[in-house]
């Protein structure tokens, strides 16, 4: 068996374990918190009084306009200067969540704003409250449009979690770095790490296509019923 293949096989369990233990939870939790934050920020931009909307615009401006790596460094290495000390994983989780929240807020705001105002008026005309109109009329239509860009954000986040290695989170890429430090085989190991990320991204992309097809059929049923 070739040396490179032997090394890849021997390293695979450690890499997969790091991915399962850190990369996957970090991705899922960051996206969940970021999506909730983004939804709240989008609603604030669209419906809250001016000062609150301005505060959200400032937050989005900061986190979309600065590099994610810099944000992670500020949280993990910078905050201790003012007495706020975080472990690596919570620091990464906060950084990724805030970053995802900024991007998803713009996606959600755009898709909510794209729903015709007549849908709101129709909902109010049959006695629905704002919450009922949002939950039963607006969100189902907006979700169909939001899934592709939100899915792309999630897939990008899977790859972005490799930046957590810079603040010592022992995720997939960091595990690869440690193996490189003992084997002195950077090309083989980093190719293997890249292939794992590629497989993850490909699986998620395939799932995205299936979800989009189902939503497209659902949208067709709605249009036919209308």
Describe every region a protein language model picked out:
Residues 1-226:
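Transmembrane alpha-helices and adjacent helix-loop boundaries
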């Amino acid at each position: 068996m070739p040396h490179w293949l032997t090394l890849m096989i021997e390293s695979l369990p450690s890499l997969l374990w790091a991915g399962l233990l850190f990369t996957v939870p970090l991705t899922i939790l960051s996206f969940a918190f970021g999506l909730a934050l983004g939804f709240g920020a989008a609603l604030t931009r669209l419906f809250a009084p001016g000062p609150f909307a301005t505060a959200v615009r400032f937050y989005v401006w900061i986190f979309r306009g600065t590099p994610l790596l810099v944000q992670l460094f500020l949280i993990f290495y910078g905050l201790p200067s003012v007495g706020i000390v975080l472990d690596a994983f919570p620091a990464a989780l906060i950084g990724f969540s805030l970053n995802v929240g900024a991007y998803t807020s713009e996606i959600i705001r755009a898709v909510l704003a794209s729903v015709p105002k007549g849908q709101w008026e129709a909902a109010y005309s049959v006695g629905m409250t704002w919450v009922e109109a949002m939950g039963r009329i607006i969100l189902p239509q907006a979700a169909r449009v939001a899934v592709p860009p939100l899915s792309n954000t999630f897939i990008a986040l899977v790859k972005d979690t490799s930046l957590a290695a810079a603040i010592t989170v022992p995720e997939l890429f960091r595990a690869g770095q440690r193996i490189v430090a003992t084997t002195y085989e950077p090309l083989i190991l980093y190719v293997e790490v890249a292939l794992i990320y590629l497989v993850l991204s490909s699986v998620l992309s395939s799932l995205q296509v299936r979800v989009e097809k189902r939503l497209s059929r659902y949208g067709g049923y709605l249009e036919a019923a209308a």
